[in-house]
């Protein structure tokens, strides 16, 4: 347990920061899940919209050092690949 007043204050500050970071990370994770649900439903407009929001939120998390940049890059890359393959499949069906 902290004995100095400054250490006690830092414990409170860290708890607040942790909660904010959890909310931001959760928001980014939820957009990724919404993208995957739109992919499963086959809704292209919703996929594009949620992809943009997910990408934006992941980049914000990287800038605030909530997640590592390589983790965000990997997730964005995988979502972009899924979006591209979905688009190619739709074009192949149209032909």
Swiss-Prot record:
User: Alphabetically, which GO biological process terms does the record hold?
Assistant: translation
List the record's Gene Ontology CC terms alphabetically.
Answer: small ribosomal subunit
**Which Gene Ontology terms cover its molecular function?**
small ribosomal subunit rRNA binding; structural constituent of ribosome
Q: Does the keyword Ribosomal protein apply?
A: yes
One Pfam annotation, family name? Ribosomal_S20p
Q: Tell me which UniProt keywords the record has, alphabetically.
A: Ribonucleoprotein, Ribosomal protein, RNA-binding, rRNA-binding
Task: Give start-end of the signal peptide.
Answer: none
TM regions (residue ranges)? none
Gene3D superfamilies reported for this sequence: Ribosomal protein S20
Specify whether Ribosomal protein is a keyword of the entry.
yes
Biological role = Binds directly to 16S ribosomal RNA.
The record, for HAMAP family, names: Ribosomal_bS20 (MF_00500)
Q: Which family does it belong to?
A: Belongs to the bacterial ribosomal protein bS20 family.
This protein is called: Small ribosomal subunit protein bS20
């Amino acid at each position: 347990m902290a004995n100095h007043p400054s250490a006690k204050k830092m414990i409170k500050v860290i708890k607040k920061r942790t909660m904010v970071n959890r909310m931001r990370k959760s928001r980014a994770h939820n957009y990724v899940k919404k993208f995957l649900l739109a992919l499963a439903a086959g809704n292209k407009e919703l996929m594009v919209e949620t992809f943009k929001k997910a990408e934006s939120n992941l980049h914000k998390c990287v800038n605030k050092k909530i997640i590592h940049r390589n983790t965000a890059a990997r997730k964005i890359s995988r979502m972009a690949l899924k979006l591209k393959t979905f688009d190619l499949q739709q074009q192949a069906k149209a032909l």
